[in-house]
Amino acid sequence: MITILPAELYRIVYFVVLTALTLTYYRQLANATQRGVMMAPKPYTLMVTFAVAFIIVVGLRPISSAFGDTVNYASTYFMMQDGLQDAPTPGDGEYVFNLLMWNCAKVMPVQWFFFIIEIGYVLPLVLACWRMDRRNAPILLLFTMSAFSFFSFGTNGLRNGLACSLVFLALTYIRGNVLDKWVCGGLCFLAFNIHRSSLLPIAAMVLTWFYRKPRTMYYFWVASIFVSLVAGGAVSNFFASLGFDDRMSSYIVMDDEDAQQFSRTGFRWDFLLYSFMPLWIAWYAIFKRRMCDMTYLMLFGMYVYSNAFWIMVICSSFSNRFAYLSWFLYPVVLAYPMLRFPLWKQHHGRKTALVLLAHFAFTFLMWLIGK
């Protein structure tokens, strides 16, 4: 078994490198003019190198409980290697992921399987950021890889992270020609068959494509808070009864004893405040400064609709996994308007740099307090 780093050092090294990258780009942005932030191309080499290093080091991580569900995935993988599990069939849930695991188990050790998953998790993000804004792709990728959910869903919620990365890449194709739309549909199909809960952001993408009214999106998001406070339990049970994702349903209806093993339950005002920040930036960009484009509307709509669903079931166990169905878009929704539009009237580069620094600082703080 390959051991690049002891398990307990992974997060430390990750944050050391992220700190260096954040300070590097902070200085670059802070010294840039408004036009320089939006128009000057930034070399992608540094961030691509970090992404490749992340794939290698994290993909070949040791099997340790420090990485959450990595241990459970490895256990299933070993059972497949020992012939203790039947081959997956198309009728099984999440067939693509199970088939990939089954075929990998025949020919390679578990670490190489995780390496492949890590490629599928990170590479779509690299491509999506480049397709979305080639001049500022490294900044978008840094925002994405410094989000506080990024590391966890590369080592813990593997299916969720992999599926959402494919949905994010699919978003960059939806506005293209007929072939691009087929690519978008194919990526969404793969995502759904990797993790069925990705149906939520996929549905949000389709809804936003046909209905792009920002004011209505805000009303819907605010209404979801009242629905959660007044009838959160009933709404959770309703979604669980739909049964489109057995794992999602089990998270919703998990009893208190089981919930103690997972995330804290109850209405998460801290999560809600965190989720609100892109909405505040969007309000300032769309309504105050009248700055928007089709890509930003699609990003914002997907984020708002997906996040509103999570708010309605926010009291459920394992609420963080529901949240990720919108949070994977969080860093890009936050960064995109500052990189594409002259959002700030004064000191645009400095304010954009401060948002980047605050974004990373929040992730670092969450790690320090053990979230």
What residue spans do the PLM features occupy?
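Short acidic/glycine- and proline-prone juxtamembrane loop motifs at membrane-interface regions
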Residues: 154-161
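Transmembrane-embedded, aromatic-rich helix segments that form part
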Residues: 185, 197-208
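Short hydrophobic/aromatic helix or loop-helix immediately within or flanking a transmembrane segment
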Residues: 71-82, 86-109
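Signature aromatic-anchored transmembrane alpha helix within multi-pass, membrane-resident enzymes
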Residues: 222, 342-365
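Alpha-helical transmembrane segments and terminal signal-anchor/GPI-anchor hydrophobic tails
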Residues: 66, 71-75, 204-320, 368
